[in-house]
Amino acid sequence: MSSLRPDEARKLATAASVSPLSNCQFCGVVISSIADEQKLEFTNKYKGSCTLLCSYDSQGVVLRVVSDDDRSHVLKEYMIAADTDAAQMGRRSYAVSLDADNLVLRFGSEQDQQLFRKVVENVKHLRPKSVFSQRTEESSASQYFQFYGYLSQQQNMMQDYVRTSTYQRAILGNAVDFQDKIVLDVGAGSGILSFFAVQAGAAKVYAIEASNMAQYAQQLVESNNVQHKISVIPGKIEEIELPEKVDVIISEPMGYMLYNERMLETYLHARKWLKPQGKMYPTHGDLHIAPFSDESLYSEQYNKANFWYQSAFHGVDLTTLHKEGMKEYFRQPIVDTFDIRICMAKSVRHVCDFLNDKEDDLHLISIPLEFHILQTGICHGLAFWFDVEFSGSSQNVWLSTSPTAPLTHWYQVRCLLPMPIFIKQGQTLTGRVLLEANRRQSYDVTIDLHIEGTLISSSNTLDLKNPYFRYTGAPVQAPPGTSTQSPSEQYWTQVDTQGSRNSSSMLNGGLSVNGIGDGMDITHGLMHPH
């Protein structure tokens, strides 16, 4: 699959790293094996001519050999890496050693041979590791791109109505920022944001996607007849080259707690392609942090860890692992949603400016905390959520993951303290949250809290890479003790009031059902008590 026109491919071929030129195909190639190196005798490896499919890979270029007659069946797959031995043979042939095969590739034209030679040379002259590769473990990157290469994962994000509709509204509501402009979509996935940019009048969109989802994005581009507007470029923004600067960068780089997956660094890195005074969509992000009280959640995690406190589990004493089990469970951030009334103080806001902050600023994020406690109770930890703003020329649009806003696939995140602290209304809770980036595309989160004027403090370090997904889909329950009137009496008062109204309607032709009245929904009070 070639996602670039030949002229664009040649422009990108100047990249010092593996460029989008590496995603192309060569038809009518005759492949021979070297049977005798001394006599230079060759034998045809495959019957008839073949097609070579080249595709970008983090290690180089994957070369797939398929028959010209049946491209659905892969005859052989090779990896062209930096240490691959290769040499030109005449004007149309190329010798290459791949795995245990010494091959001669005879191309259908000189141009094809030159283009393939360029593919190999690009791999052999790779730049030093990109910024992304330096900060990311290979296993983590592989898992990450494999995850986002599944259509089901893209569907999960696309079906987040709040997320997708907010992006579309922000882009279409600021069409002046996109009309006849050059746009860069970072981590394009299915390309949905690129399509929104075209809907807003963009002249050209470069959609960068490092996972296998790039091939599906290309299919969508072609089936929607916008290939003249959207160029899908497989690869990482840290490694590819663009033929020009852009007016606008769009992306959806937010993870749990805003920073998880470290995609924000990639988003900031993309600014190297942004023209002066260019736009970023979104423009900045606010991370909100608040202390919370939730005895049920704390007990749930604590009781899980107590599994390891058994001294006779099928005749085996597990207690030696109890301490480690407790530590592991409390190192897990909890991803779910909650009633904001569990928060004991107004949230502290930490701002990330996508237009001006540097990548390095996100390697170690230190957030000072000061909370003025609004209600007496036990603080079990800190709750996190984020908002992002799209600052456009026509209007500003916000996307919120607050517990007071419609639920999104980001939910909210809570980090527990192994040792909760009792705190009174009017006291001040101070401390710090430290987010330390790691090579697993995530953060180690350290929380330190202290009640001002006392010796009471508590701390914990959590692994944001290993969250506990607790959300069940059940309605959020109000915190215990928030009812100021009898819920039973409230409900029956509501029934009496509704019944009285329906009795009045009967005089105008309404019907009575069991003496209650026509059209009355008696479940409403049960489901939504005031």
From Swiss-Prot:
Pfam families named among the record's database cross-references: PrmA, PRMT_C
BP-aspect Gene Ontology terms: chromatin remodeling; peptidyl-arginine methylation, to asymmetrical-dimethyl arginine; positive regulation of ecdysone receptor signaling pathway; positive regulation of transcription by RNA polymerase II; regulation of DNA-templated transcription
UniProt keyword Methyltransferase, yes or no: yes
Post-translational modification remark: The dimethylated protein is the major form.
Claim: S-adenosyl-L-methionine is one of the keywords in the record: yes
Signal peptide residues on this chain, from the entry's feature table: none
Keywords: Chromatin regulator, Cytoplasm, Methylation, Methyltransferase, Nucleus, S-adenosyl-L-methionine, Transcription, Transcription regulation, Transferase
Subunit field text: Homodimer.
Catalytic activity: L-arginyl-[protein] + 2 S-adenosyl-L-methionine = N(omega),N(omega)-dimethyl-L-arginyl-[protein] + 2 S-adenosyl-L-homocysteine + 2 H(+)
InterPro entries on file: Arg_MeTrfase, PH-like_dom_sf, PRMT_dom, SAM-dependent_MTases_sf
Domain SAM-dependent MTase PRMT-type span(s) in chain numbering: 141-450
Disulfide cross-links: none
GO terms, molecular function: histone H3R17 methyltransferase activity; histone H3R2 methyltransferase activity; histone H3R26 methyltransferase activity; protein-arginine omega-N asymmetric methyltransferase activity; protein-arginine omega-N monomethyltransferase activity
Protein name stated in the entry: Histone-arginine methyltransferase CARMER
A GO cellular component annotation in the UniProt record: nucleus
Modified residues (Asymmetric dimethylarginine): 501
Upper classification of the organism: Eukaryota, Metazoa, Ecdysozoa, Arthropoda, Hexapoda
Its EC number(s): 2.1.1.319
Binding site for S-adenosyl-L-methionine: 154, 163, 187, 209, 238, 266
Function comment: Methylates (mono- and asymmetric dimethylation) the guanidino nitrogens of arginyl residues in proteins. May methylate histone H3 at 'Arg-17' and activate transcription via chromatin remodeling.
Localization of this protein: Cytoplasm; Nucleus
Stated family: Belongs to the class I-like SAM-binding methyltransferase superfamily. Protein arginine N-methyltransferase family.
Recorded superkingdom: Eukaryota
